[in-house]
Amino acid sequence: MRIELLLVVLIFMISHPGVGVDAIVEKEEVSIEVISLKNFKIHKKQRVQILTPEGDKFARLSYAEDEFIRNREFVVRVYDASGDLVDTFTKNVFERELLFKGANYYDDAQVYSLDVSRQNHPYTLEISSITHREWMFDFSWNPISSESVFYKELSLTISRPADLELEIYTNSRIQHTASLEKKVRSDFFKLGGSLGIKKEPFGLKKSGSLVELIFKNFDYNGYRGSLESWESFGLWMNELWRKKSNLNEKALAEIYPDGFQNLNDSAKAKLAFDCIKKNMRYVAITYGIGGLQTASAQKTFQSGYGDCKALTNLMCSILDMVDVESYPALISAGKNDAWIDPNRPTHNFNHVILCVPNQGDTIWVECTSQNAPLNYLSDFTDNRFALLLTPEGGKLVKTPSYFYHENLASRNTTLSISSTGEVEIFFEAEYERLAMERSVFQLKNAGYQDEGLIRYFTNLKSFEVENLEVEEYASDNPRMTVSLRIHDRLFTKKMGKKLLFTPFFYTGQFPAFEEEERTEPIYFRRGYTYVDTIDVIFPTRMTLDKFPESRSVETDFGGYQLETNLLSEAEGVRFVRKVYYKEGEYPKENYSEIKGFFDTIKKDESIKLALIPKS
C-alpha cells in the first residue's frame, strides 16, 4: 500500500514539475452525527505521512474548548519510516492555555496543543478525535490547505433526523451521495487524488470550502432561530439583544449637558461618539453566550468598558433616546474577512459596528476605536457586506469603499549627498484615508521606536533618526502628516571615483506578482495613488554620468509617470513620480500587462545611479 501510494505521488510530481510534496494525507474521515439541534458529535480520523520538515505542521496539533464545545477524545499514534509504532499520545498530555490573552480579553475559550513532530523523516501519524458541540449554525469542510500536500482520500459524512432541514453547497469536484434509513438521512461527500491549491495573490474573495452545510434552524443556549433568510437571522439577533437597550436619564444628561433638542442627527451622533471615545474602554468579551449577546447599555455605561457589541449597543441606545435612528451592523472585520454570499444566509461575522441612516446621508461608526473619526471606516471594515439589525430583521448592505484617488500619499524628499557619500534626508509626507492606514508611521503613536519604523519601510542600512514628527487629523476624510530627518552614512557605495545610489529608498508599497501565468482574475480590493517628488543635491563638482529617461504608461487599471529634470536652484536633479492603480476586478487575460506594469515600477525603483566628477 505504501509503495503504491508513493508511486501515485511520484507520477503526480512528474506531471507537475516544480511542485514538491511535504506530506501525504493518506486518508481523512470526518463524521458528524446530529442528535438534535443542541447535541452534535464530530468524529475525525486522519492518517498522514510526513516527508519533510515543512510537513511537520501536521504534527503540531491543537483543539479548542469553551462552554459549548468539549473534546471527548484525542489519540495520536506515531509510526516510524518502517511502519513500526513508536509513540502514542492522548488528550491528557496536551498543554492548556487561554485562547485569548491580555488585560483586554474576557473569554472562557481554552486551546490545547501538542507537538509530536520527529527529527527523522518520513514518519506517519494516525489521529483520532471526538468533539461534542451544543450548537451549530453551519459547518464548512475544507481539509485542503498547502500546495505541497497530496491528498489521497478525503470524506465527510453527516447523519441527522430526516426532518432536520439542511442547506448543502458543494464544490464541483466533490462526489455527493445520500441515503435515508429509519428516519435518519445521511449525506456522504468524497474527494480523492488531489494536490493542495496555491492561492494566487490579489484574487477574488470566494468560498474556500469543498462542502458547506447550513442548518436552516438552530438553537443557541435556548434561543431558537432560523437561517432561512438574512431577515430571519436578524430577527433572532434582535431577540438575543432584547431588553439590553435600557439607559437612564442621568446618563443622557452626562452625554448632552447642554441638551439635544436643537441638534441635528449628525451632531447628536458626534456627541454620543465623543462620549464613548472619552469614557469607555474596549474589552473583548466572548465568555459563553456573551460571544453573541450584548451587555445592557446601562451596565456598559456604568462600568466604563465593553466589547464591540456592548459599545455599539450603548451608542445605539443613546441615539434611540434622542430620537436618532441607528442599527447595529454585524460584519466580518479584518484583512482576512470571511466570504459572504448575499444569497446564502449564514453567520460569518466577528465584529459589530453602528449604522446611522441620517436621512439618506449614512454615518458609519466604529465604536471600539478611540482614534477613528466619526463616519470613517478603515481597511478593517470597509468595502464588505454588513448585516443591519433593523426592527424588521436583518438587512444585508455594503459598507463604503474609497476610490484610488482618495487614498492618496504625497511625499516630498530631499537627498543632500556629501562628497564622502553620506546623505542628509529630509522627508515630508501627507497620507489621506486608506493610504494613512498603509503607512508605517501610524505605528509611531502606538509607541514603536523610530529606528524600527524606518527600517521597516526603507532599505536604509546605517542611519540616525534626527527628527520624526507625526500628526493625525481626525475627520471623515482623515489624514496624517509626517516630517522626518535622517542622516545615513552608507547611502552611497563608492566605486573608484563614482558614488552609486538609489534615489527611491521606500520598499514594499506596490503589488508584486511572481508567477508567469494566472488562472484566476486579478482583484484590487482598494486602489491607491502615490505622488513622489525627490530632489537629489549633488556633492560639489560632481554630476550624474547618465540621467534616467522619463516614462509614461497609462492603462485601464492604472498609470505610471516618471519625469527627470535638472534643478534650477541647485546642482542636482528632480524625480517626479506618480503611480496609481484602480480598485476593481480585471480578467486573467490582462495578467501579463498588469505584472509588467508593476515589474517596470520595481525595476525603476531599484535603479543604480552614478555620481561622477565633473570633467
What are these regions, as identified by a protein language model?
Residues 18-615:
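A sensor for short, sequence-defined functional sites
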Residues 3-14, 315:
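Sec-dependent N-terminal signal peptides
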